[in-house]
């Protein structure tokens, strides 16, 4: 970008921060040079039944990828998230639930959550679920989803949470792969005023002849909508939990016992069941939550992610609850029924830390000041961003409009497979640059390598790898360790390959440039699609953009840009020329888009990620096999884009 914005650490943060710049340097050096000492100390953030003596036992060696942390220690995750807080903070609010309908909200104390989790843990045992069994959870954003997850952890069952937006086919595939014995769902979900037929989707999934492991379906009554009922298989949540005792002793788990499976889409083939274990994962989720959000006991914390994604696991539930925090769970969407809904929720609950995604920020940005109308957001002190690289323009808007120019923005880079934050600012220790994830978290050793795996020193760019293990790292892919090794450790030997590219600037700050397959090669020059998208979105009339490469006879690849304009703006030949020149000015002639495709909407998954694979195929005119579109929030978008494409003159 033509300009680097730099933000100093605000005085109000510096005065009471947990980690200042000097402490960051000292702790980071210790975490790299003496990982056993550092993580041995950090492990004390949890209560252990049998204290660990071993800390780190890991290998990234070809043919021998093995990751173990705290392997001789025992603990229980639910006891760390609930029981240990009861004596001093039992009446503290654990979960604030804000419904899709703004008139519905409730506060659940640690004591109440503990009671419900114990009762549901006993329910699971009565249904024959035991330590090591897999339970599929396909729930809306309601407190019972958290109860189900914590109850599984309490008895040692492995949960596999499936995002409530996934299709019956996707649900069936995940149940089959994990051999889930029980499904927990609701009659319906509610989102932006619309019902989501969760129970019907489960019924359809269970009709798949390859689903033969499921014994029962527990159904929460969320809306009271009509559902089909399978006597003997289906059970109402309220019926089973009412009969269960609130007295339950948590199961003693080894640190390396499986905690959950979370499916993430592979670049090829079927989804991968990423497996996380108990001890190292929770140490990492709690430590990263505490330091990255500079958590203080009076904070009200809101992570907007769904429980169906890893962000919902680590930073809506487990990290905050392990630290005894108050976490807000929101059933709705940030811009419904009004563009100011997110800001209204902040004011209503006096939220101090807000963690959301660039896709939400850009949607609000397109609404302009309507996104903050009638709100003051004065309670906020820290903002966070997750899910994809945030373009500097959206970062600045978020900082300025949502945070009133006083809240540091922690732009966190991490993945389902990492369990927690990897590259991220710390509010009291890091000067910020809009669009940069900045520096590695404690114990994280990033490197940039070329395509042959040679490390690149200094200010440079390359493939982002991690050269040594950290406690939150996924241990394997469920039932397929060979694929785990193949996917993450075979491209570059003795290193974990993230699949992302990044550049490092003169200050050692990292800038994520997007997936490596989202890098264009135009006339022999590498261009990150994120960089071009950022330039496009910095245009005052553009709300969102997605850039892909298309084959070009001379340049190798040409640049094809899908562009969504702000409300009230219309495409015109003049604007077409203006936008192309704008990018040329921002980045250089090489980055000038060859094609602008005006469109009202882009194909997105329900978590807000743009499906670039589909955009690449549409742009290239290759519509023979668009692959699985079941995870799209609105599959109709694809048809519309194909129609629009017909009218576009393509470069030769």
Curated annotation (Swiss-Prot):
What name is this protein filed under? Acetyl-coenzyme A synthetase
Q: What class of enzyme is it?
A: ligase
| Binding locations of ATP | 387-389, 411-416, 500, 515, 526
Q: Keywords in alphabetical order, please.
A: Acetylation, ATP-binding, Ligase, Magnesium, Metal-binding, Nucleotide-binding
State the needed cofactors, names only.
Answer: Mg(2+)
Please provide, alphabetically and separated by semicolons, the GO molecular function terms listed in this UniProt record: acetate-CoA ligase activity; AMP binding; ATP binding; metal ion binding
Which Pfam families does the record match to this protein?
ACAS_N, AMP-binding, AMP-binding_C
- Reactions catalysed, as given in the entry: acetate + ATP + CoA = acetyl-CoA + AMP + diphosphate
Where CoA binds, per the record, is at: 191-194, 311, 335, 523, 584
One annotated GO biological process: chemotaxis
Disulfide bond sites: none
Describe the function of this protein. Answer: Catalyzes the conversion of acetate into acetyl-CoA (AcCoA), an essential intermediate at the junction of anabolic and catabolic pathways. Acs undergoes a two-step reaction. In the first half reaction, Acs combines acetate with ATP to form acetyl-adenylate (AcAMP) intermediate. In the second half reaction, it can then transfer the acetyl group from AcAMP to the sulfhydryl group of CoA, forming the product AcCoA. Enables the cell to use acetate during aerobic growth to generate energy via the TCA cycle, and biosynthetic compounds via the glyoxylate shunt. Acetylates CheY, the response regulator involved in flagellar movement and chemotaxis.
- Residue numbers carrying N6-acetyllysine: 609
Sorted alphabetically, the Gene Ontology cellular component annotations on this record are:
cytosol
- Binding residues annotated for Mg(2+), in chain numbering: 537, 539, 542
Q: Which CDD domains match?
A: ACS
**In what way is this protein post-translationally modified?**
Acetylated. Deacetylation by the SIR2-homolog deacetylase activates the enzyme.
Family according to the record: Belongs to the ATP-dependent AMP-binding enzyme family.
Enzyme Commission number(s) from the entry = 6.2.1.1
* Source organism of the structure: Citrobacter koseri (strain ATCC BAA-895 / CDC 4225-83 / SGSC4696)
Q: Which Gene3D superfamilies match?
A: 3.30.300.30, N-terminal domain of ligase-like
């Amino acid at each position: 970008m033509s300009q680097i914005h730099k933000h100093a650490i605000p005085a109000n943060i510096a005065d009471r921060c947990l980690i200042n710049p000097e402490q960051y340097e000292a702790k980071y050096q210790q975490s790299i040079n003496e990982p056993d000492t550092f993580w041995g100390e950090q492990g004390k953030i949890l209560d252990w039944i049998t204290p660990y003596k071993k800390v780190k036992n890991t290998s990234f060696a070809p043919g021998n990828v093995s990751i173990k942390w705290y392997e001789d220690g025992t603990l229980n995750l639910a006891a760390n998230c609930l029981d240990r807080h009861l004596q001093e903070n039992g009446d503290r609010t654990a979960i604030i639930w804000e419904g899709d309908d703004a008139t519905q909200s409730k506060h659940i104390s640690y004591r109440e959550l503990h009671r419900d989790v114990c009762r549901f843990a006993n329910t699971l045992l009565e249904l024959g679920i035991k330590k090591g069994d897999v339970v599929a959870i396909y729930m809306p954003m309601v407190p019972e989803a958290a109860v189900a997850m914590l109850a599984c952890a309490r008895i040692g069952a492995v949960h596999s949470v499936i995002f409530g937006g996934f299709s019956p086919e996707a649900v069936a595939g995940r149940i089959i792969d994990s051999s889930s014995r029980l499904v927990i769902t609701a009659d319906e979900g509610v989102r932006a005023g619309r019902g989501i037929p969760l129970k019907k989707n489960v019924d359809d999934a269970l009709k798949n002849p390859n689903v033969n492991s499921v014994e029962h379906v527990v159904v929460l009554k969320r809306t009271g909508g009509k559902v089909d009922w399978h006597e003997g298989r289906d059970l109402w949540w309220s019926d089973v939990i009412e009969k269960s005792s609130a007295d339950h002793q948590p199961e003693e788990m080894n640190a390396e016992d499986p905690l959950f499976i979370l499916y993430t889409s592979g670049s090829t083939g079927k989804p991968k069941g990423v497996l996380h274990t108990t001890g190292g994962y929770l140490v990492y989720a709690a430590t990263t939550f505490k330091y990255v959000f500079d958590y203080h006991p009076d904070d009200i914390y809101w992570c907007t992610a769904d429980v169906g994604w890893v962000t919902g696991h680590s930073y809506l539930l487990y990290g905050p609850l392990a630290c005894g925090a108050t976490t807000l769970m929101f059933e709705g969407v940030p811009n419904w029924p009004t563009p100011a809904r997110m800001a209204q929720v902040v004011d209503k609950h006096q939220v101090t830390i807000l963690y959301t995604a660039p896709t939400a920020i850009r949607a609000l940005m397109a609404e302009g000041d309507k996104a903050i109308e009638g709100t003051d957001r004065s309670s906020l002190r820290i903002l966070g961003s997750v899910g994809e690289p945030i373009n500097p323009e959206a970062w600045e808007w978020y900082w300025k409009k949502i945070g009133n120019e006083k809240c540091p923005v922690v732009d966190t880079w991490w993945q389902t497979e990492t369990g927690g934050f990897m590259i991220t600012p710390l509010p009291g220790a890091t000067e910020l640059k809009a669009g940069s994830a900045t520096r590695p978290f404690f114990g994280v050793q990033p490197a940039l390598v070329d395509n042959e795996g040679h490390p690149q020193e200094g200010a440079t760019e390359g493939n982002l790898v991690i050269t040594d293990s950290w406690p939150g790292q996924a241990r394997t892919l469920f039932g397929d360790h060979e694929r785990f090794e193949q996917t993450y450790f075979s491209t570059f030997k003795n290193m974990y390959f993230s699949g992302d590219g990044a550049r490092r600037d003169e200050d050692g700050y990292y800038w994520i440039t997007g997936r490596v397959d989202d890098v264009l090669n135009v006339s022999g020059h590498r261009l990150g699609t994120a960089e071009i998208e950022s330039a496009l979105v910095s245009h005052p009339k553009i709300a969102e953009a997605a850039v892909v490469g298309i084959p070009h006879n001379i340049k190798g690849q040409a640049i094809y840009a899908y562009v969504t304009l702000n409300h009230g703006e219309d495409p015109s030949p003049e604007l077409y020329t203006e936008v192309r020149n704008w990018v040329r000015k921002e980045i250089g002639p090489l980055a000038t888009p060859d094609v602008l495709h005006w469109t009202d909407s882009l194909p997105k998954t329900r978590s807000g990620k743009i499906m670039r694979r589909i955009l690449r195929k549409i742009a290239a005119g290759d519509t023979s096999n668009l692959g699985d579109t079941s995870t799209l929030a609105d599959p109709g978008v694809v048809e519309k884009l194909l129609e629009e494409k017909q009218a576009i003159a393509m470069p030769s």
